[in-house]
């Protein structure tokens, strides 16, 4: 199985896959707890929140240097996990967030949150969660005259946030995997995606393709579709993929994965 998108879906599904002996590789679920149960058939081709959160925090510490930082999250496994990781690292560096609180996924009116951000003179906001809520927060912040800089993870980094927030999405900082669609070695694949009217720029497109690559290469190398044999091969082999050379550790996580900070633009594009 190649799946799933959200950590909150992947984690309970992984219990079933392990119990039934089904190999699963997720290209999008980043919660560290997914691979901390000792399961043998669960892998991923994306970095962990425990990598991405500290990476974002170091950028905040070294580049943003906020005076009054707020950390907001959606109270879900992915978003709150990232927010907590950012909080822990910035606090170690002496930055004490003036706010750390959650919003409810699916909410539409964030006027109370924005009023509190303004009262606390917040000049920088890290948001852990997905694009639907952050898009509305950005748009409503612009409407209410709140102009602090915002930053979020790959869960907010897609064109839909620009559709929701409009001009208010300009200048949003987003941590994402590098733009694998810009790699010269991947241009034939990019053209193939475009020929089928598929967008090759999403953060999980090439990690998902790499997941298929490592699974099929393992099947060819072992001559088997047995999950136990495939899992053993995945843990013992280095793979050349569209996202670079991949190696898995004993837990099924990548031994190395890099994130990049991008400036988001209102037209749905990004620049490093």
Which residues fall in each region the model found?
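Extracytosolic ligand-binding ectodomains
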Residues: 1-272
């Amino acid at each position: 199985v190649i799946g799933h998108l959200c950590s909150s879906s992947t984690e309970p599904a992984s219990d079933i896959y392990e119990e039934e002996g089904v190999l699963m590789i997720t290209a999008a679920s980043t919660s560290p707890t997914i691979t901390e149960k000792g399961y043998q058939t669960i892998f991923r081709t994306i970095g962990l929140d425990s990598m991405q959160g500290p990476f974002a925090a170091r950028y905040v510490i070294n580049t943003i240097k906020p005076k009054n930082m707020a950390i907001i999250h959606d109270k879900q496994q992915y978003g709150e996990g990232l927010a907590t990781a950012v909080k822990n690292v910035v606090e170690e560096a002496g930055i004490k967030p003036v706010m750390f609180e959650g919003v409810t996924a699916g909410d539409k009116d964030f006027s109370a949150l924005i009023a509190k951000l303004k009262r606390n003179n917040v000049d920088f906001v890290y948001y852990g969660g997905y694009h639907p809520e952050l898009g509305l927060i950005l748009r409503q912040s612009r409407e209410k005259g709140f102009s602090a800089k915002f930053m979020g993870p790959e869960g907010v980094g897609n064109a839909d946030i620009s559709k929701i927030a409009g001009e208010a999405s300009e200048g949003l900082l987003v941590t994402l995997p590098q733009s694998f669609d810009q790699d010269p070695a991947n241009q034939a694949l990019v053209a193939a995606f475009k020929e089928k009217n598929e967008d090759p720029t999403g953060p999980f497109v090439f990690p998902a393709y790499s997941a298929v690559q490592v699974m099929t290469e393992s099947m060819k190398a072992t001559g088997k579709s047995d999950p136990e044999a495939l899992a053993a091969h995945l843990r013992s082999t280095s793979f050349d993929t569209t996202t670079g050379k991949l190696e898995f550790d004993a837990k099924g996580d990548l031994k190395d994965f890099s994130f990049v900070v991008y400036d988001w633009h209102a037209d749905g594009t990004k620049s490093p």
